[in-house]
């Protein structure tokens, strides 16, 4: 079973059909990159998956649990998350402190090693202030 499964997803901005029948599966532990030029629908796809943008049709399941049509908070509870593009960080906190802000309910206040394994540049810059990053 796929950790994330998307079948025939359709999203619109008003009457403009912007995501057409998108279908894909992501296995547990798999890393996926969504790439494309500006305006190709990368952010729109992610906003559709997390529920920020409503979809008109299609199925989204997380670990076998249907989440299409559910509110954003229910999708987060199912294990989904979304980090928007741009500088949506605290500029006066370090990179490490910015990462830790998302770990408020965790008793061990250290950045998990898997984050640095997947994104080694974060480890190299963990002491830099977020506002100083380019």
Where in the sequence are the language-model features?
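Short coil-to-beta microelement around the adenine-binding A-loop and adjacent beta1/P-loop entry
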Residues: 16-17, 74
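Short beta-strand immediately N-terminal to the Walker A/P-loop
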Residues: 32-33, 82
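ATP-binding/catalytic-site motifs of ATP-hydrolyzing domains
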Residues: 59-61, 65-66
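ABC ATPase NBD coupling module
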Residues: 66-87, 112, 126-130
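Short coil-to-helix segment of the ABC ATPase nucleotide-binding domain corresponding to the Q-loop/switch region
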Residues: 92-100, 126
